[in-house]
């Protein structure tokens, strides 16, 4: 089952470069110093080199070896501006406008990924989710065949057997009212994400109804989405619509859906909307004593993840490992 040691071993074999858009933030600097000491990731800090160095020195963090790139003094800015204008030509962006936009650390950092200078990006310690995600949607864009970006939380809790209990929950942060087809896409992306963390995905499309016990448009949406997902991913164990207790409790599953291979053993949960998803993962985190990692953005051409503005340095460090491992 999942442990960060597994991801670190993968990264040691193929170290990645990760952009931190808030290079002066002490939490970012502490995480970067830990990553540099471990030597399995190469941090790129965006910002004024003098301010970053002063902040690191004041906080007592050794960031020697980190690459610092200043948007105001970038030797490939003309190339970046030209590419940005090409990517945004449908909006009629001029070079002067591009230079102004690229003074934003979020847009600048995202373009570093787009240009191949970095493999992934982590931001949001001081910016809103919208400010962090918008450049990725405009510049990195979705993978071929994908129509949306979604999100997944990985929840980890030590079990009595000594192995970690690991679950995946989606979409808890991005899509407010996903359609049936969007739920299908979310399920497929979440299952692939789950595999990276050692989960053999068993997918449950959650509802207040189990296999027809309730009725209504919301029930129909989850039932139809589960049916479409089974058709699209024939090798992926999927159940739905299903209530949470039937999805996770074998005793309840034997009563409500005894023929299901997923019921009672689900580990990848697809919520009907963002309300249910956000509430659900936070209940698991606060009352179930799970560590929650995310939101992990799914469906992009390159990893771009969003931190909570209330994050600490340990959470930055963990999300950096996760983000790099997805590259």
Model-assigned labels for residue ranges:
Residues 1-263, 268-327:
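Anion-binding alpha/beta catalytic cores of soluble intermediary-metabolism enzymes, centered on
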